[in-house]
């Protein structure tokens, strides 16, 4: 089916974002160890891309080969384009690592020792390490009729070994497989006295290639090659059939490691007959094979910056600030009573959010706490505070999203711990992931000489995750505004109970009012532009894909509305097309921190409506998730959001990329004055 207006391909857009991430590794202004980290981040992103998006594309081709993508391409054509671009990206990534980053690291005394250049002393150390630390954990599998090719785990490091000779039972040995357990280190530090470098490292693959013969005694090792298989990692839970989501999910999680293969990675020097065998065993074609120079898993190199104590090769450390309104208050409740508080992470600390919950857990006046959890990590002081509150007799209700991708197991564990201390745990609404970020605290206070209940709320654009709060840009609002607090109470009521849709005063909520309000706000700007009034839309988000929103934005451009979009990742809208979108610009900011806040600005004939949200403008966020968008009404806070969240990004000429009408991005070039959104905010807020 052809589309009525132009859209860009989602998968190609995701790869485009990863190209921008990889460009950070080529930027000489980025510290060297951080450049290595960006290469690793690209690998991690590609892993998820193959596990989810490519797996889905392959499934669609199998199930409905004649179907078309939303942008009007046949599935097979789209797949071919995506594979070609992914191959180019991987090649560029490894070329950058081996020709630029590793040589630069060597100049700084950080070196990876290859097994074919070990000295006698290094060889002896490596042999001892292999025999003592690796060999006892490894299990060789010889391939014969009694030992078929094993179904190796998703993203595990494996070695295929060509053998010659007969084993103890007289069987002719041809091939063996060794899977490296995840518990084994992928990078081992060589003693400095042996290395000759300040920081010398040996990859696990180097140990294996040199000593794998120890696993196959009295056989000749003809070759040893590493490989890695990526599998479909989407979980299937039939939401119409299940009676207990947590139990169903626990039964499904182990299968994630053994889903259908979607990608094979091999070292570039792997013999072709070995590659063919691996492809056959995996059910993959030649296009699905990625030949790389060196290690097949660069994600594990992410630990190198942490192992190397070289502050001069890393981003400058910073201390996030605490707003004076909080620093000067006796308690968080006193601070919020004085007025709404806006927090801009990571420039302002996430600690006040933790302190609000910790104080609530210990405050005898607090009677109830309600909290949503999407991602929070395996070691979370926020979850500790919720459990403390439950142990202290508070009415604690936690909406835990069990289907947060790749955090399912962590969230199941937290749900069990919360229930064990008496908290009420619910899993939201089946069929609608709860992605909204909400905290509601109910406290008994004295007012006019009598006790009354007062609500306090925290709403955010990002997760309740202390670690990512230092890595992602997000806004959070603390308020005791009666209407907002009542709205949050109603949303929790919907999530935990059963009943009809409740009217909200201030919040826009998906899957009910968020999409209609966005469309309505765009149409107001269209009407104002047609009436000769000033009209403007500025929106910042991670992704823009929803067709009816894109259609409305195209119509806005045609009506003369100036539209500036700041979309970090994939954007299906084509900007700058004459007669369609010449009044629309699309920028992407890629820098030290992951741009994560969602901000919607509508000029509204001078009223300037500003909303913060956890929702991207995507089908899933607007129709298949529980999300909220909340207004920033207080004038000073509104100016802050506009200035810190939007204006600095629109003015950035160092870390910003501008989308062209063909979907490709060009880096904005600095003029006489360099403007970097993130560095400017660091300088403003942090010490």
Curated annotation (Swiss-Prot):
GO terms classed as biological process: polyphosphate biosynthetic process
Gene Ontology CC: polyphosphate kinase complex
Residues noted as binding Mg(2+) in the record, renumbered to the chain: 375, 405
Protein name listed in UniProt: Polyphosphate kinase
Catalytic activity: [phosphate](n) + ATP = [phosphate](n+1) + ADP
EC number of the protein: 2.7.4.1
Catalytic residue positions: 435
PANTHER family in alphabetical order: POLYPHOSPHATE KINASE
Cofactor: Mg(2+)
Phylogenetic lineage: Bacteria, Pseudomonadati, Pseudomonadota, Betaproteobacteria, Burkholderiales
Keyword field contains Magnesium: yes
């Amino acid at each position: 089916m052809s589309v009525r207006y132009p859209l860009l391909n989602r998968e190609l857009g995701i790869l485009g974002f990863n190209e921008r991430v990889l460009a950070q590794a080529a930027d000489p202004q980025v510290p060297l160890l951080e450049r290595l980290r960006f290469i690793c981040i690209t690998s991690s992103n590609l892993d998820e891309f193959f596990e989810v998006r490519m797996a889905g594309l392959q499934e669609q081709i199998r199930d409905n080969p004649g179907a078309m993508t939303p942008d009007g391409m046949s599935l097979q054509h789209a797949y071919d384009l995506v594979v070609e671009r992914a191959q180019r990206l991987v090649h560029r990534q490894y070329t950058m690592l081996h020709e630029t980053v590793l040589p630069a690291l060597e100049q700084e005394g950080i070196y990876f020792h290859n097994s074919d250049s070990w000295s006698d002393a290094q060889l002896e150390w490596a042999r001892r390490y292999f025999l003592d630390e690796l060999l006892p954990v490894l299990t060789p599998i010889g391939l014969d009729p009694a030992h078929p090719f094993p179904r190796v785990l998703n993203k595990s490091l494996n070695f295929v070994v060509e053998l010659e000779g007969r084993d103890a039972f007289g069987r002719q040995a041809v091939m063996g497989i060794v899977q490296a357990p995840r518990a084994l280190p992928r990078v081992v530090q060589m003693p400095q006295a042996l290395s000759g470098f300040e920081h010398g490292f040996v990859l696990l693959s180097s140990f294996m290639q040199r000593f794998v013969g120890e696993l196959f005694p009295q056989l000749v090792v003809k070759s040893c090659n590493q490989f890695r298989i990526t599998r479909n990692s989407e979980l299937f839970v039939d939401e119409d059939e299940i009676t207990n989501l947590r139990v169903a999910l626990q039964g499904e999680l182990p299968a994630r490691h053994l889903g259908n293969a979607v990608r094979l990675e091999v070292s570039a020097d792997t013999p072709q007959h070995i590659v063919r065998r691996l492809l056959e065993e995996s059910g993959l074609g030649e296009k699905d094979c990625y030949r790389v120079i060196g290690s097949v898993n660069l994600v594990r190199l992410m630990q190198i910056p942490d192992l190397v104590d070289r502050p001069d090769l890393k981003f400058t450390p910073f201390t996030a600030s605490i707003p004076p309104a909080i620093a000067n208050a006796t308690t968080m409740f006193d601070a919020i009573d004085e007025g709404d508080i806006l927090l801009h992470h990571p420039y302002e600390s996430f600690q006040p959010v933790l302190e609000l919950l910790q104080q609530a857990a210990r405050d005898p006046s607090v009677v109830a706490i309600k909290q949503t959890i999407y991602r929070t990590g395996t070691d979370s002081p926020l979850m500790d505070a919720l459990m403390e509150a439950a142990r202290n007799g508070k009415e604690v209700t936690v909406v835990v999203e069990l289907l947060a991708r790749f955090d399912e197991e962590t969230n199941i564990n937290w749900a069990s711990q919360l229930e064990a201390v008496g908290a009420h745990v619910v899993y939201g609404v089946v069929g609608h992931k709860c992605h909204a970020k909400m905290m509601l605290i109910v406290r008994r206070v004295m007012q006019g000489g009598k006790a009354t209940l007062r609500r306090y709320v925290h709403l955010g654009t990002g997760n309740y995750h202390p670690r990512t709060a230092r890595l992602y840009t997000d806004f959070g609002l603390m308020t005791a505004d009666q209407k907002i607090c009542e709205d949050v109470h109603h949303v929790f009521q919907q999530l935990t109970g059963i009943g009809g849709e409740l009217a909200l005063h201030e919040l826009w909520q998906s899957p009910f009012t968020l999409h209609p309000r966005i469309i309505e706000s765009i149409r107001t700007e269209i009407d104002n532009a047609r009436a000769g009034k000033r009209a403007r839309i500025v929106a910042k988000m991670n992704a823009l894909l929803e067709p009816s929103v894109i259609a409305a934005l195209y119509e806005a451009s045609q009506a003369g509305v100036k539209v500036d979009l700041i979309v970090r990742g994939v954007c299906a809208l084509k900007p700058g097309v004459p007669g369609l979108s010449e009044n629309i610009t699309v920028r992407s900011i890629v820098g030290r921190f992951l741009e994560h806040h969602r901000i919607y600005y509508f000029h509204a004939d001078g009223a300037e409506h500003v909303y913060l949200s956890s929702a991207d403008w995507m089908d899933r966020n607007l129709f298949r998730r529980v999300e909220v968008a909340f207004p920033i009404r207080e004038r000073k806070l509104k100016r802050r959001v506009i200035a810190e969240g939007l204006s600095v990004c629109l003015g950035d000429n160092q870390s910003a990329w501008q989308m062209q009408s063909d979907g490709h991005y060009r880096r904005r070039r600095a003029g006489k004055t360099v403007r970097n959104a993130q560095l400017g905010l660091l300088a403003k807020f942090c010490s």
